């Protein structure tokens, strides 16, 4: 594996974690928004990732088992999907956003889970950044060794 591959893999990981962090931020920002209808209520969003393989093939866990000789080349974001779990309906007839039956709908966002996901994404981003810095140090040491004969 070349250093360029390490940079590509770490860079794709950082990009994926940035998407994850942005999605978490959006979920937290909308956690307390309300609506008078189910259709207009914010639903939690989650990114979907896939491994990129040498030769451009990508896929989820099924393709990992189909081609065990393929070397991973990074991660890509396939998209962001809405969580289809139930929304919370509260009977609050005095709420300004209540519908004609007195119900207000709250998003299906669990702030505690989102905070844990944010910490995980942040640490993953940091790990990828450290991997890039380590590869950069190895590259510099390799260049010095070739140019100056240093060890």
Over which residues does each language-model region extend?
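Amphipathic alpha-helical polymerization modules
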Residues: 1-144
């Amino acid at each position: 594996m070349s250093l360029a591959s390490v940079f590509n893999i770490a860079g794709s990981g950082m990009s994926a974690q940035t998407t994850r962090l942005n999605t978490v931020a959006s979920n937290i920002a909308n956690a307390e928004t309300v609506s008078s209808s189910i259709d207009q209520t914010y639903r939690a969003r989650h990114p979907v990732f896939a491994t990129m393989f040498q030769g451009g093939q990508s896929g989820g866990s099924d393709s990992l088992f189909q081609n065990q000789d393929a070397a991973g080349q990074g991660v890509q974001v396939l998209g962001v999907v809405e969580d289809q779990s139930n929304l919370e309906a509260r009977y609050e007839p005095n709420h300004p956003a209540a519908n004609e039956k007195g119900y207000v709908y709250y998003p299906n966002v669990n702030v505690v889970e989102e905070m844990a996901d944010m910490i995980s994404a942040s640490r993953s981003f940091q790990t990828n950044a450290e991997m890039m810095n380590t590869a950069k140090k190895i590259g510099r040491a390799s260049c010095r060794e070739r140019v100056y004969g240093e060890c």
